[in-house]
Curated annotation (Swiss-Prot):
GO terms for cellular component: cytoplasm. This is UDP-N-acetylglucosamine 1-carboxyvinyltransferase. It catalyses: phosphoenolpyruvate + UDP-N-acetyl-alpha-D-glucosamine = UDP-N-acetyl-3-O-(1-carboxyvinyl)-alpha-D-glucosamine + phosphate. Pathway: Cell wall biogenesis; peptidoglycan biosynthesis. Its EC number is 2.5.1.7.
Amino acid sequence: MGKLIIEGPARLNGAVKISGSKNAALPIIAASLICDRGVLLENVPDLMDVRTMIDILNSAGCKTRFAENVLSVNPPEKPNTDIPYELVRKMRASFNVLGPLAAKYGKASVSLPGGCSIGVRPVDYHIEGLQKLGFSINIEHGIVTAELGERPQEVLISLPFPSVGATEHIMTTAAILDGTHTILENAAMEPEIEDLANFLNDMGCKVFGAGTRRIEIFGVEKTRECTHRIIPDRIEAGTYAIAVAATMGDAVIENLQVSHLVALFDVLRSAGVEIQQIDETAIRIKMNQRPQPVKVQITPYPGYPTDLQPQIITFLSIATGTSTVSETVFKSRFQHVDELRRLGAKIEVNDGTAIIYGVENLSGAQVNATDLRAAAALVIAGLMASGTTSINEVDQIFRGYENIVEKLSRLSAVVEYFE
């Protein structure tokens, strides 16, 4: 695994352009499996996870071409519905090809997924949803096989928790079950859900209510060719916003959707960050003092996002008092805390809540990245810290941040990557 060397402290300034959303691109690329004609996707970020999902489509027999953030997908002439373990193990989102493949071709097999190790992230909701849609499910030797049986005319699925992955999986699968009317309650409301629904509708599907807790899907028989542009990555935008504030910098963040990050901006303002909205797609972040302590609760959208939890803890580690961050989505998502302590942070974790006792500054050290967003948090910490910070096993960061070394360098950071 690679290593990132950061010389700090930095003060980020300038401008950074946000890439297309990883969390929107992955389910949309997976949904391309149901296309009867070609689809063209624009603003697709060039990331390890995106490349893996494209490999999965190629394994299924699709014909793809990916260049300059544009992906074309054409349906297979001879489909393969048994997706190999070596692809699926790399990331959790790969499991979302099971339902679309089985709905399209009658039967499919996918290994249980891999991805970030950040606590319990069960696929039970996915499987229960597929069963209600008329699929028989068999799990043997780590492989899940779904086979389409008699299609129900009316289906009501109520998720116990508004899972993003389960919402996307069920929505995409139900979209091509011709003759089936599906109501999905307690659905996730994230912007990526809306983007997926817009893509499905661009293909001729009939999905209504995405972005609310109740989604209605009328299955269609055929889809049409379409062109769709992926929304900006709100997690990347939020990460850079926190990084600028944490380094007491002054920078403009471009090509984001400001309305997607209201919860983050509320927290940053409470901590004393100056945020100037230039327009709907650009903001200026400015900070010239240590942050004020705040209380943050991590909840499903439109609340504060779990994927920005490690970053905000890092920012608050130099606050002028004691802050708390309570995690309600992935309660064990605190592996980064031990690494932050190595840099001088004073943090306790108790029953899903991090208690952060602000210190005056951090100091560079060797640390290990435990997952994608933890890696991003450690990068921010390295930018904040005095001296040299060496982040080992940092390759995970390339799963979610396009050209991060180049972007940070353009913001005046001193960052170097070693394989």
